Regions:
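Feature captures the catalytic ectodomains and active-site-proximal regions of enzymes
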Residues: 1-400
């Protein structure tokens, strides 16, 4: 049976007083997710392995069944793969955010969601001023970019900037985990401080300030790693061909290493205005020839990081009606059965504006299966589901 996973990044949350003690998933109007839960089986998944930070790379790799202690090499290496960079022996890749600092405060992790066009101009300028034979910046999407350090030591204690909005940034700068990594930590911290000097008066930032927008006035490198040794999903599970649909470099990079076809969708932004319908139709087209599709939607996570409850509810409802609804209605017409799974990768609670490692709700619908008693899809309804809590590769094996 063919299968599709629809992943609402950061969709899970905690009860919110302003919503009458409900979570955004409970409060949102989600007829299609509820219908799939009613027709299918539900439970929770532990997507963050013990000892790991609840990052999207950790959680999404877990959803796909990868053994994190064996294959995890950080976010940077995955994003390098997504832009076609072939990471070589001796090279260290890092995610490099363009962030906004205000005085000594890390104001936000995204520079007010700077456009890719603006960011590309800044990344090229950073290469001119700070690049060398050992240091190179590569443009990604919006605020999410790549830093390659030749000869870097990955044994570093780095803080994801989305975890610490409105905190003083200096105590959060990079620290070595072992004495041998001190040189790399010093190099990267100097790059952070130098970037602030050269970016503060750049024309892109002056224009943004004049328009009332946050400037991208600092880099913030984090999540270092080397080239990972990952099996493809075809090798792990035996299907012939799969695909991934996402606007996020990280997820696309996971797809590259997982052996999945990376599908581009016009208007897929990784933000609230993404092309939900286009992604759904692309998934349907892919399912005609592929055995497996991983459809990832980032919008809920971004709303959680902004701490915007109303926006998070709206993104959940958009995912339900403008993507899952299209898929559900069309797949009901197909002669060939398709299994459908829906879940978040991790919670991104609006109250704290960052990820947690709380197990997430999931549903699996397979035509002809015996459903459990759950009739709504949210963090608490699935506590009555068939599966309890699944770990490691248990979820993906149940689906496939």
């Amino acid at each position: 049976m063919k299968s599709i996973i629809i992943l609402g990044d950061g969709m899970a949350d905690e009860p919110i007083e302003a919503l009458g003690g409900k979570t955004p998933m409970q409060y949102a109007d989600t007829p299609y997710m509820d219908k799939l839960a009613e027709m299918g089986v539900t439970g929770r998944m532990k997507t963050v392995a013990d000892g790991f930070h609840p990052g999207s790379e950790v959680a999404n790799m877990a959803v796909l069944g990868y053994d994190l202690p064996t294959v995890y090499e950080g976010r940077g290496v995955l994003e390098a793969a997504s832009i076609g960079y072939d990471l070589k022996p001796g090279e260290m890749a890092m995610r490099c955010n363009l962030i906004c600092v205000e005085g000594d405060i890390l104001k936000n992790h995204s520079s007010g969601h700077i456009t890719t066009e603006e960011a590309d101009e800044l990344i090229r300028f950073l290469n001119e001023k700070l690049g060398s034979d050992h240091i190179h910046f590569y443009t990604g999407v919006s605020y999410r970019h790549l830093l390659i350090v030749k000869g870097g030591d990955k044994r570093l204690d780095c803080t994801p900037p989305h975890d610490v909005p409105l905190h003083p940034f200096r105590p959060l700068m990079i620290k070595p985990e072992v004495p041998e990594a001190q040189e790399t930590a010093d190099l990267l911290n100097n790059l952070i401080l130098q970037s602030q000097e050269i970016l503060k008066d750049h024309p892109v930032n002056l224009r943004r300030i004049a328009a009332g927008k946050d400037p991208a006035n600092s880099i913030w490198p984090w999540s270092p790693g080397y080239r990972p040794a990952m099996q493809t999903m075809q090798e792990m599970y035996g299907f012939k061909q799969g695909s991934v649909i996402s606007a996020v470099d990280l997820i696309r990079g996971i797809g590259v290493y997982a052996g999945l076809e990376v599908i581009d969708v016009e208007g897929a932004t990784g933000l609230y205005d993404t092309n939900y319908e286009g992604k759904a139709h692309a998934a349907l087209e892919a399912l005609k020839t592929n055995d497996f599709v991983y459809l990832h939607v980032e919008a809920c996570d971004e709303a959680g990081h902004e701490g915007d409850v109303d926006l998070k509810i709206r993104t959940i409802e958009n995912l339900d009606k403008r993507a899952i609804g299209i898929l559900f209605e069309e797949l009901q017409k197909w002669d060939e059965p398709v299994a459908i799974a829906v879940l978040p990768d991790h919670p991104t609670p609006c109250a704290i504006r960052t990820h947690t490692n709380t197990p997430v709700p999931f549903l699996i619908y397979k035509p002809g299966q015996e459903p459990d008693s759950v009739t709504r899809f949210d963090e608490f309804s699935v506590l009555e589901g068939k599966y309890g809590i699944l770990e490691k590769d248990e979820f993906i094996k149940e689906l496939l």
